[in-house]
Amino acid sequence: ADAPVTIVEYFSLTCSHCASFHNDVYDDLKKKYVDTGKVKFIYSDFPLDGVGLRAAMMARCVDERRYPGVIQVLFKTQNNWARAADPIAELKKIGQLAGLGEEAFESCMQSEALANGILAERQKAGASGVQSTPTFRIEGQLYPGSRSIEEFSEILDPLVAKN
């Protein structure tokens, strides 16, 4: 959809502040701005560690229509899989729930092209000023750290009104 305002979220699936945003603020932001066509929301991987990279890879291997839902599940269950003795096995279970078969999961985890693509995305974001997660790029301006729906509204309402 051609929403007038774009938000890019730079996130790591192992970042607790990112999980707080997705668990506490994202649904309100989506209802108020994305579902109404005012804002386009783009996910940009910025993995902070190897487990975060693997989680990002798994999410990217799922059918793209299921991607936003998988991201939400990963954040809602972050404490379970990210701190598990075997996080990859936990990611595999989540992938299976999203329709990613065992072979598809294994080839996904072994895809150097996918890993390199995600790391290149992170490097590009870093070069453009992103230093931590979550960071939000709203119409070219960077906003590091999680924010409340009220804080997002203060930023977004004038931009939406302008367009």
Language-model segments: residues:
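A short beta-strand-turn-helix
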Residues: 1-5
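Residue-level signature of catalytic and energy-coupling elements of molecular machines
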Residues: 7, 15, 105
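Structural alpha/beta surface segment adjacent to cysteine/selenocysteine redox centers
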Residues: 11-13, 19-96
